[in-house]
Amino acid sequence: MAVLDIVTYPNKVLKQISKPVERFDKDLHKLLDDMYETMIKNNGVGLAAIQVAVPIRALLIDIGDEEGKQSKDTLIEVINPEFLTWDGTQKDTEGCLSVPDYFDEVERYKNVKVKFFDRFGKEHVMEAEGLLSVAFQHETDHLDGHLFVERLDYIKRKKFEKEWKKLLKQKRKK
């Protein structure tokens, strides 16, 4: 397994709409394994393929067990996700490996039902609530070319853009 480079905002790659996965083969398995290594190394709870510059509809979610411990047992590999139902709303603080060091409150659906395939092409339907629901929505947004900061209201979005420019300037000085 390899740790892959994560594409960061404002790279235009993140705006691409990902294509459906058609082949469930060893190349897909290697990508998923490398994505898992990358996500864990970067302390993430989710990672979409587009975040490692691969524009396919594949993502990982691992919110951990009851104690927050992540492992292959708590990993959900999601290929070609499709939301079947959604209801309620909740606000939670989100962050993103593609927008490092920035966190803000985003409103999402509280409950979702998602149809997807695993690495072997087996179909699954899962109901998710709370953090898992947020993770499904956040990662699927990536597949559609959207970042969580686009869901911020106008004032928060302007604040983000100002803070982001400041962070970039600080990083360039180092």
UniProtKB/Swiss-Prot annotation:
Record's cofactor remark: Binds 1 Fe(2+) ion.
Annotated positions binding Fe cation: C96, H138, H142
GO terms of molecular function: metal ion binding; peptide deformylase activity
Gene3D superfamilies to which the protein is assigned, alphabetical: Peptide deformylase (3.90.45.10)
Catalysed reactions listed for this entry: N-terminal N-formyl-L-methionyl-[peptide] + H2O = N-terminal L-methionyl-[peptide] + formate
The entry's keywords: Hydrolase, Iron, Metal-binding, Protein biosynthesis
Protein name, per record: Peptide deformylase
Taxonomic lineage: Bacteria, Pseudomonadati, Campylobacterota, Epsilonproteobacteria, Nautiliales
